[in-house]
Amino acid sequence: MRRSVNAYQLASRFGHVNQIRRERPLTREELMYHVPSIFGEDRHTSRSERYAYIPTITVLENLQREGFQPFFACQTRVRDQSRRGYTKHMLRLRRAGQITGQHVPEIILLNSHDGSSSYQMLPGYFRAICTNGLVCGQSLGEVRVPHRGNVVDRVIEGAYEVVGVFDRIEEKRDAMQSLVLPPPARQALAQAALTYRYGDEHQPVTTTDILTPRRREDYGKDLWSAYQTIQENMLKGGISGRSARGKRIHTRAIHSIDTDIKLNRALWVMAETLLESMR
């Protein structure tokens, strides 16, 4: 696996995020306060005249009319304040009828107006017991919409394309839950995750550390339990370990939109690949 990010980096080049999550649809006021870039009124000065500027709030309002509601939103903080209203932001949306539950499929909508991102939609999965927001791999499909032409209609079409793979996500989850992992396979999955996150030179924690569940529901021996445990430990951090110099540390939580998406997606692919190899 290739090295993804520096072991002790707080975030990617996009910096920390402002974020909000609720157990109900977010209000316009909450979005305005926490994620103002959704309401940006014009493209960044670095964008050309060919850039079709459609505020994310316009896209969101159209998605809401189609029955999709935001439950989580965040945007990256930037040092260059001129980009604050244009910076990358992410929404996690649920469809009417799939609002609550222990496991809820979601549409992940990414965008920015400073040239760092097109509209991007990915399938996701929310686990209520640990507030884990999973990102499913590219094998299940994702949609990119450039800032050109009829953006709103294409994003709405993309949302329905993502909804179309929700059943396949459920099927993958059921298959992972039914597959009992022998200890060597659990260790291999955890080692692949550590290598992706930290590289080969130094890993501040061990496979045993990231395979240690945070709640009794994850003490199963199946692939789904191992994947969930690794995902939560890697993203939430707080695990005691040692730096390359031997200093005692705690792993940091991931606050970067980019790193969250990349690591989350990679973990799904690892679990999915292991599932297929052991069937």
Where are the regions a protein language model picked out?
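Amphipathic, interaction-prone secondary-structure segments
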Residues: 53-118, 268
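Intrinsically disordered, low-complexity regions enriched in serine/threonine
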Residues: 1-16, 97-103, 109-279
